[in-house]
């Protein structure tokens, strides 16, 4: 019997949750484990117990590899109020204006959910949560960055309605694989995202999952979508797109350098000819 070809590298291999569309697929499946994983992850990031989450219907399910479609809208509840969130995985920093992009998204989210005539005291909290597979701020060692509106003295809060949270995964690579009971919940989640698709970390990944119920649900959800050949095709297409993009940029840079060299030589010859004529 002929073995069916698959992009899955070996039985039991897991997809890479650091790939933007895979991250989204992990948390947006219509399954109990996917919802439980998302609820637990948000509870860890927001540092408060979240009791329910609802994903925007216009964003379900993942259907495109376009990076702009990897953000998904969430309404979540704690014991007292609703909160509105955009959440995403960002594999690359394509510009030096990532902070401007985050501000736009959180402002757009708040504007979308605040109804005309609403009492200002009823304006909900809006969050932009970005899990980053790159370092955004090299001036601090902490990989968990939270931004709110403050006065210029940096001490007094101006508003808590809009918040931006970055989880910089590369900074957690520096934390050794210590006994899991010594890790914070956020550190465990970061290591889950970092290690999920790495075969040599599979045993530590199991220990992580067994130590945190929410991460166990995330592991189950990731294992479930890893059975799908369509998801492996999506992940492969993602890496192909990145390679094509890098090649295009590299080619453009080399052409620019060659053109600049030609223009420099031409100007040098012209200057030399002018000097000879003096």
Task: Go through each PLM region and give its residues.
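Elongated, amphipathic alpha-helical interaction scaffolds
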Residues: 1-278
């Amino acid at each position: 019997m002929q073995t069916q070809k698959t992009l899955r590298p070996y039985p039991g291999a897991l997809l890479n949750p650091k790939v933007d569309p895979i991250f989204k697929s992990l948390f947006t499946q219509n399954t109990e484990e996917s919802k439980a994983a998302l609820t637990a992850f948000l509870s860890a990031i927001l540092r408060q117990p979240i009791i329910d989450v609802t994903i925007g219907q216009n964003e379900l399910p993942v259907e495109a590899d376009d990076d702009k479609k990897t953000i998904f809208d969430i309404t979540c509840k704690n014991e007292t109020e609703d909160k509105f969130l955009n959440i995403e995985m960002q594999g690359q920093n394509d510009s030096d204006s990532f902070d401007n992009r985050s501000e736009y998204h959180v402002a757009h989210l708040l504007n979308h959910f605040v109804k005309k005539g609403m009492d200002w005291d009823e304006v909900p909290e809006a969050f932009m949560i970005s899990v980053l597979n790159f370092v955004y701020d090299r001036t601090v060692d902490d990989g968990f960055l939270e931004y709110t509106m403050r006065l210029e003295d940096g001490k007094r809060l101006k508003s808590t309605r809009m918040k931006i949270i970055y989880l910089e995964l590369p900074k957690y690579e520096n934390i050794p694989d210590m006994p899991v009971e010594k890790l914070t919940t956020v550190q465990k989640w970061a290591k889950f995202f970092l290690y999920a698709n790495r075969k040599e970390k599979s045993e530590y990944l199991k220990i992580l999952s067994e130590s945190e119920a929410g991460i166990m649900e995330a592991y189950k959800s990731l294992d479930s979508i890893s059975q799908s050949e369509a998801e492996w095709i999506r992940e492969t297409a993602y890496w192909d797109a990145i390679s094509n993009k890098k090649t295009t940029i590299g080619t453009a840079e080399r052409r620019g350098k060659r053109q600049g060299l030609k223009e420099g030589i031409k100007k040098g010859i012209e200057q030399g000819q002018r000097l000879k004529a003096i």
